[in-house]
């Protein structure tokens, strides 16, 4: 005989099926076929239902068992439907309902709290658990302080622990390292130790600054040595092509002062005598007379030359008049046919004659040599004085041409030899002209 019961959602109905094997015929009897047997089964089912109703209040609090019982009942319902539909040919025995929970089971093992462990151990805590709990409490306290002050520090113990939110009561994962179980005190476990690490970092920063300063001092010394080496190399590389030689510089300076160079250089290099210097002065005056001759032929004196001679009386540009210049002035005056006497009378040159004839300190001769020359020029009278003034005025322009050619080049080969007969003849002829000059204008 098989008993099937429905779930709590359906009405409680029991069906009894009896099979008569004595008659060798499969006769299926419906419920209440026999009064004696059916009554006995009904009473037993009623007792079971009453017990189930009593336990329904308890099973509402027990979530896991109630869910499991409902699943078993649903499965049994599906099995009954298959049985009535005739689909359970292979399996003639339907699935039985799981037995109801025993009311004598203690409540402690049935009720499971949501935040409690699945089992309550009544054993005493061991040394290992106490050490792990102490280390865990220290670590949680240090982490709480760090989060409160918003300080994030990296340490070697961060790899062994997993931080959780503050709302979860600072729980840590079940995976603990070997060092945590032994209760080690790491760098992050104490606040004072963290300060010590910070101090060490600051000291290391100061050391870095010191090393940089020392390196900069060494660098400055190396730069000084390198600069000294470059200066030494530049001194060795000095040559005539780049910086010039002192001899060339000396010659350039001497070219700026040709009167100094003409006297000193010729004495040192050639060794001419004093007579040659007198002849050189005469040749310079000859060059000036050529220019004066051109001026006299035009019949008009150049005012620029006159201003040039009178504007700077103290300049060493002029030369003392010589006999040859006086001779050429007399000849040109007679050819131009103009009165030199009238010009001398109108011009105030005679009064300022001392200022019109400047002296050169280096080229000038000694007082003993100049004195007879002055006497000769003054002995000829007023006419000679005017002609000397003409020669002096031209000498300023002649000196500008001498600046262009500082070295004296004689025009004729006879002038190179001051002791020749030609120069003596010219000197004698000039002396004769001095004696005859007053009679030209009678």
Swiss-Prot record:
Inducing stimuli: Up-regulated by white light.
Protein name from the UniProt record: Protein PHYTOCHROME KINASE SUBSTRATE 2
Organism this protein belongs to: Arabidopsis thaliana (Mouse-ear cress)
Residue segments, region Disordered: 110-130, 394-442
Record GO cellular component, one term: plasma membrane
UniProtKB keywords: Cell membrane, Membrane, Phosphoprotein, Phytochrome signaling pathway
Family: Belongs to the PKS family.
Residue stretches of biased makeup (Polar residues): 397-406
Subcellular location: Cell membrane
Tissues of expression: Expressed in leaves, with the strongest expression on edges of the laminas. Not found in roots.
Phenotype of gene-disrupted mutants: Increased hypocotyl growth inhibition and cotyledon unfolding responses in the very low fluence response (VLFR) mode. Reduced phototropic response. Reduced hyponasty when grown under blue light. No effect on negative root phototropism. Auxin accumulation in protoplasts.
Membrane topology per record: Peripheral membrane protein
Note: PKS1, PKS2 and/or PKS4 are essential for phototropism but not for inhibition of gravitropism under long-term blue light irradiation.
Oligomer status and interactors: Interacts with PKS1, RPT3, PHOT1 and PHOT2.
